[in-house]
Amino acid sequence: MKNIILASASERRQELLKRILEDFQIIVSDFDESSIPFKDNISSYVMNLAEGKARSVSKKIMDQDNNLVIGCDTLVAFNNKILGKPKDKKDAFEMLQALSDNEHEVYSGLAILDVKSNKIIKDFVCTKVKFSKLTSFQIEKYVNTGDPMDKAGAYGIQGKAGVFVENINGCYYNVVGLPLNKLNSMLMEMGVNL
């Protein structure tokens, strides 16, 4: 059996991975995301970021055979512009104000790297999310909880911001941060039977 390593510090990703895998390791990637410039193709961009995270971790464990490293990156896009994690409360407020009464996309790139053979597979998932119309009071109250500060697009669907979501088209777990259905298929492609 292959040793599975998640290249992420995200507690949300760790919790989600536990739903399909009982045994895995966590090694946090030190990959510099700014080393990959965005060039208008969001799906390629998130897959390249996921690969960078997986390769960064694989370099730390080169002497160990039988490892598969999972890299993942999730981002929010609105009007073909990437909304990363907010810099401060004002930035979070402005992001949420822009998303109010609008549809946006959540992209996750996945990369699974077999450390021994250097074989890698990459894919992505895109989910459309529509927010209801939010008042300034709702946005400010949510921003003041601190919840949006470590999340792409300044919200977490699994938390208090879940009430902002009018509808979703696609994988819910993608919006949380780890598209389980796609990951499951990719792991099976790499020989992991779940």
UniProtKB/Swiss-Prot annotation:
Q: Which reaction does it catalyse?
A: dTTP + H2O = dTMP + diphosphate + H(+); UTP + H2O = UMP + diphosphate + H(+)
Q: Which GO terms describe its cellular component?
A: cytoplasm
* Broad EC category: hydrolase
Spell out the residues of the site Important for substrate specificity: 12, 74, 158
> Could you tell me the Gene Ontology terms of the biological process aspect for this record?
nucleotide metabolic process
For this UniProt entry, the molecular function terms from Gene Ontology, in alphabetical order, are:
dTTP diphosphatase activity; UTP diphosphatase activity
- EC code(s) of this entry: 3.6.1.9
Keyword Hydrolase assigned to the entry: answer is yes
Q: Which cofactor does it need?
A: a divalent metal cation
Q: Where in the cell is it found?
A: Cytoplasm
Q: Which keywords does the record carry? A: Cytoplasm, Hydrolase, Nucleotide metabolism
| InterPro entries linked to this entry | ITPase-like_fam (IPR029001), Maf-like (IPR003697)
So where's the catalytic machinery, residue-wise?
Answer: 73 (proton acceptor)
The UniProt entry lists the main location of this chain as: cytoplasm
Q: Which family does it belong to?
A: Belongs to the Maf family. YhdE subfamily.
**Free-text function comment from the UniProt entry:** Nucleoside triphosphate pyrophosphatase that hydrolyzes dTTP and UTP. May have a dual role in cell division arrest and in preventing the incorporation of modified nucleotides into cellular nucleic acids.
Q: List the protein's name.
A: dTTP/UTP pyrophosphatase
